Amino acid sequence: MARPLKVGLDYFPLDVNIDDDVELLEAECGLEGFAILIKLWQKIYATGYFIEWNDDIELLFSRKINADKNTVNSVINACLRRNLFDNELFQKYGILTSRGIQKRYITA
């Protein structure tokens, strides 16, 4: 009998010397912004290396993590500005991902 295919990752690396863009996100959005980013990474890596993002998903995600929808939206916009997520792919396909996310997924 074939082994079932694994979807997503059980863990992802979080460097102790975090990227300056993440530090800037935390400076801009506070610890809540940092926590939202980590929760987004968890959601992404749980299923692969990107997630679709739209108003309904944002509403469900906000409810799940008990955060204000406007705060989540503000953090995502800051992540897009700071290239923590690829803005071009977000605008074109409505997905949250980045080269770094994809690289970590492939090497994990």
Segments predicted by a language model, with ranges:
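Winged-helix/helix-turn-helix nucleic-acid-interaction surface
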Residues: 1-13, 20, 59, 63-108
